[in-house]
Amino acid sequence: MFNWRAIYNKILYLLLKIVVRSHIIPPKLLAEICLDIQEPMMYVLPYNSKCDLLTLRILCIQYQLPDPLKPIFIXGVRFPRYLFIDQSCHIRSDVTKQQQYGRILHNFITLYRHNSCSNIQILPVWVMFGRCPGKESYKNKKTTSIQFFCLLKKIINVIWLGRDSFIYFSPIGSIPISYIANSNYTINSIMILKLFRLGRIHFLRQKRIAIGPSLLVRKHLFEKLLASQTITKLVEDEARSKKISIKQAQQKALVIIEEIAADFSYETIRLSDRVLSWIWNMLYQGLYVCNADRVRKLAEKGHEIIYLPCHRSHMDYLLLSYILYHEGLVIPYIAAGINLNFWPAGQIFRKLGAFFIHRTFKGHQKLYSAIFREYLYQLFNGGYSVAYFLEGSRSRTGRLQAPKTGTLTITIQSMLHLGKKKPIILVPVYISYEHVIEVASYTKELYGVVKKKEGLIHMISGLRNLRNLGRGYINFGEPLPLLTWLNQQVPQWQDDINSIEGNRPNWLALTVDYLAVTIMTRINNAVAVNAMNLCSSIILASRQYSCSSIVITRTRLLSQLKCYLELLRNVPYDAEVTVPNVTPEDLFQHLITLNQFTIKNNSIIYVSSEKTALITYYRNNIQHLFILPSLLAIIIIAQPGISRKLIHQKLLSLYPLLKVELFMRFSYQELPHVIDLMITELHRQDILYEQQTKIYPVPKRMDELQLLAASGGRETLYRYAITFSLLCSYTRINRYSLEKQSIIIAQHLSKIHSIYALEFIDKTIFSTLITTLRHEGYLSDSGEIHASQAKEIYKFLSALISPEIQTSITNALYHIKTVVN
């Protein structure tokens, strides 16, 4: 006699193997959900679906997990390896089915209690075909026609969305069946119903994590925005001031809303996923993601997540959304500059969740800023994930830029405006690449070339740079719970909930500034160290300023790589930093594949003068990791036999400037201990030695110490020396003049000494430096200079820079003062 059910299952299984290609969530399955494949397990699914069960079976066989169709035995009693919570995704289980599932669960728990030696793992699994938001589950309808249409819809979904299916595995214990089994609770029908209810809640929560709330309908959104009290008042003011009708003013507001608002499209996301998967595989040698599991856990707890990534490239928009989608998380609404709103990129980005904003609201009307603020309120209130770049624009130097706090201010205002204690989590995100396609244009912009406007022609011309881009890295940093943080920093913030629109609390500006710096510091803490940024640091350090090109031997590069890797591993900057767990030789072999350098006979690395400026971008990605070791090496080379105490004093005097400029994490109290750890590590590497509390370089390892000294610290000292020389030359100088003259001298030094560091002539970095000098008391708001403090620092700096650089600064300063007078 034929087993028709087995034949049916086999045919369906083979068809699904052809049609379905599932993504597993989480990608690192065994590690994240604490699964022991040696122990027996039972799969719990949300509803009875043969397609889902067989799709799960395909994946289980692929990953060598227990086959869900094979039963498990407890004390000789046979149980199915799977359990359904409900009969259908749209229909609550009928009484018969509910009782059947209930009996299975009751018998399972009873036998589990009597066989305590058994450690059976309960694994909740949800198979999802497509992730289009807005679908409702568990409707209380039950008719034959509805069941028929559900089946038809399932068939269509499997065929149409089979290549876009996701299988979500929840951690062991997400549905507390094992906990109940191990407890003293009485197992009766009420307890079984409670367990089923907990299962439904878990899967509903899982659905929210995966697909988010229903998509915003643009028409309804526009009506909501226009109906808000703030915008209604501003529309009336606009009509009155411009002497136009209310309808014309509303039309003007609608144009602004149209310009800003995203237009999410799930089909566009599906198509883009296919295209981007092909692009990443073709152009990159891999995408490396770290700590995505911590974001997933936050989402599981019901937190609303705001992603705050650093900004390196236009690729960031696509990469962040792509990674989140493949990690099983909702794609966020992401802020994009209005410069990207050109055909066809603007329409595509908008369909992928981009909303467009001007880089600054200065010069724009009140109506625009009010509409943008109200739009963000709607996103936050609706529970949508949001992402925006605190830096405001792409970094041209490879470092983090000073944060733009406008959108962050609106984020905090939204909590006050909505009057709710929403569990908002700010997630810093570090994004980096071994090859940034725009880096050549960044260099030109810093040297004064006018930035080209983005457009279709510009985009097409940039496609020729899309080749061999190495690896991409995305690290999710330490999350910051906004509510908890506000309670610590501003305990009285709740007094301003529902405050009058337009009246900012007195504490808001300073709080936002401090919050922005905290986020930027956490982004830097999550830096990804890779072959390109490590080797770029060493290669640039080996350059002689009299030479435009660079030549370094393989042996020298490998020796310094070993030094740097050991320093990063043994004196970690932060636990969030990711350091490649490979040998220096492995890094070098990977460097060869990037084709960024000319390598002769596999032993000599040659870098042209044109490339020298470009690779400073990658060195700057990790400059905050090596700035303290670099300055330490400079001090010891300049003053061999210096004491630890004096080293502490010198570095502490510069640290306020470094901390602000590079968003460094150490407090002033921690710094001496960190310096001592670095000295100890360099002593262990036989690069330094200590004699009678004095620190000396080891002569035979002087080359390693000199390369370490040149890893970003020298150019920093040159910039500081320029600005402090100006402070010592005047009794009073305004901020604008100090900044302008510092840049002129820096440009002069850059030209005559071939200093290619991108940040060396960056106006924003000098602006940040001068702001810090004011905060530290070297310069008053009125322009008065505290000469004694400035002269003390300049004397210290002069002892650390070469006589040639010092002479050039003096000559340039004399020339400037002559012109001014």
From Swiss-Prot:
Organism superkingdom:
Bacteria
The record's Gene Ontology biological-process terms are:
CDP-diacylglycerol biosynthetic process; fatty acid metabolic process
Q: In which pathway does it act?
A: Phospholipid metabolism; CDP-diacylglycerol biosynthesis; CDP-diacylglycerol from sn-glycerol 3-phosphate: step 1/3
The listed locations are: Cell membrane
Reactions catalysed? sn-glycerol 3-phosphate + an acyl-CoA = a 1-acyl-sn-glycero-3-phosphate + CoA
Membrane-protein topology: Peripheral membrane protein
Cellular component per GO? plasma membrane
Query: Does the keyword section mention Cell membrane?
Result: yes
For this chain the motif HXXXXD motif maps to 310-315
Q: What are the record keywords, sorted?
A: Acyltransferase, Cell membrane, Lipid biosynthesis, Lipid metabolism, Membrane, Phospholipid biosynthesis, Phospholipid metabolism, Transferase
Kindly give the InterPro entries that the UniProt entry links to this protein: GPAT/DHAPAT (IPR022284), GPAT/DHAPAT_C (IPR045520), GPAT/DHAPAT_LPLAT (IPR041728), GPAT_PlsB (IPR028354), Plipid/glycerol_acylTrfase (IPR002123)
Gene Ontology terms for molecular function = glycerol-3-phosphate O-acyltransferase activity
Per the UniProt entry, the Enzyme Commission number(s) are: 2.3.1.15
Q: Does the keyword Nucleotide-binding apply?
A: no
| Domain statement | The HXXXXD motif is essential for acyltransferase activity and may constitute the binding site for the phosphate moiety of the glycerol-3-phosphate.
Identify the NCBIfam families for this entry.
plsB, PRK04974.1
Q: What family does the database annotate?
A: Belongs to the GPAT/DAPAT family.
- The name of this protein is Glycerol-3-phosphate acyltransferase
Native species of this protein? Baumannia cicadellinicola subsp. Homalodisca coagulata
The uppermost taxa in this organism's lineage are:
Bacteria, Pseudomonadati, Pseudomonadota, Gammaproteobacteria, Candidatus Palibaumannia
